[in-house]
């Protein structure tokens, strides 16, 4: 029995020695391969070149910031932003010296290498979503970034890149936003939803001129008597060819139910007004539902928004 125990002890000791010294037993080239595998993966293609160019410009390694929701879930946005026919790149990142997310614009030089042109600091430490919009009546494209702060406050920034300069043309707090052509013009509009101190929901419609300045086209409020906040917003076309806005608002005694409001843009008054195809009260009654995740959306991709109703 004692010999068996001693044999086991010797075997365990030898095994520990082998495990502890396994690294020293590896040839130098194999050790290098192991170390390479343990490193963080490097991006390839344009993404890798953009990351390298940004790090070289910063003099340190940037931490890429990924949007947490939306259609664009990459920290890299490749698009012709200034309308010159050449592809530009926007990169979302932070560094050890910045508290908020930063936006860098890069372009290719004559040799085809990416170079940082400018960087601006954003509005918060988290990127909620990113989208591209054509808010101006030009060939340029704007970058729309939604930020979320630590207190769960939401801030929207619209960036324009023109003549080699990155400008922030809008900074505003919001709860929901939508980029759509509501007014029927040649460019898209920006619709912002927010809840006021009295509990009412404010709908703000903004359009941009050729110089990039936003003007307030319409402001509407949803009564605090019925709604306590904005859950979602969607836009689509109607059978009459007009553009409609569907707002889902929190309602009910508990504030956990949803009901919908249908609005359209009236060119004469230049306001968002209730649609006449169905009365506001009737739509409220038929769309009142107790499923908070059942929001209005274009389910079949035909450009028409479907509004859920509560079954009898």
Protein language model regions, located:
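Beta-propeller-forming repeat regions
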Residues: 22-312
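N-terminal secretory signal peptides that target proteins for export/translocation
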Residues: 1-5
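Sec-dependent N-terminal signal peptides of Gram-positive bacterial secreted proteins and lipoproteins
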Residues: 6-26
């Amino acid at each position: 029995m004692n010999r068996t125990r001693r044999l086991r002890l010797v075997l365990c000791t030898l095994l520990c020695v082998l495990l502890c010294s396994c690294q020293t037993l590896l040839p130098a080239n194999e050790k290098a391969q192991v170390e390479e595998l343990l490193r963080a993966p490097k991006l390839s293609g344009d993404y890798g070149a953009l990351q390298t160019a940004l790090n070289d410009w910063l003099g340190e390694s940037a931490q890429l910031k990924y949007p947490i929701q939306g259609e664009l879930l990459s920290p890299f946005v490749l698009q012709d932003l200034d309308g010159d026919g050449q592809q530009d790149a926007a990169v979302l990142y932070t560094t050890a010296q910045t508290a908020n997310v930063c936006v860098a614009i890069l372009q290719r030089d004559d040799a085809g290498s990416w170079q940082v042109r400018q960087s601006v600091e954003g509005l918060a430490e988290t990127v909620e979503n990113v989208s591209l919009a054509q808010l101006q009546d030009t060939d340029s494209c704007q970058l729309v970034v939604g930020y979320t702060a630590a207190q769960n406050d939401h801030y929207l920034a619209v960036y324009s890149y023109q003549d080699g300069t990155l400008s922030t043309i809008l900074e505003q707090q919001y709860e929901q936003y939508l980029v759509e052509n509501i007014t029927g013009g040649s460019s898209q509009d920006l619709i912002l939803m927010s809840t006021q101190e009295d509990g009412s929901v404010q709908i703000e419609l903004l359009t941009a001129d050729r110089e990039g300045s936003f003007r307030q086209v319409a402001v509407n409020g949803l009564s605090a008597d019925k709604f306590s906040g904005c859950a979602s917003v969607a836009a689509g076309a109607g059978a009459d060819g007009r553009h409609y806005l569907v707002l889902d608002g929190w309602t009910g005694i508990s504030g956990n139910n949803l009901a919908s409001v249908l609005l359209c843009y009236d060119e004469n008054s230049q306001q968002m007004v209730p649609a006449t195809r169905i009365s506001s009260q009737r739509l409220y009654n038929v769309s009142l539902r107790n499923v908070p995740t059942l929001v209005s959306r274009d389910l079949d991709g035909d450009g028409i928004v479907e509004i859920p109703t509560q079954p009898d």
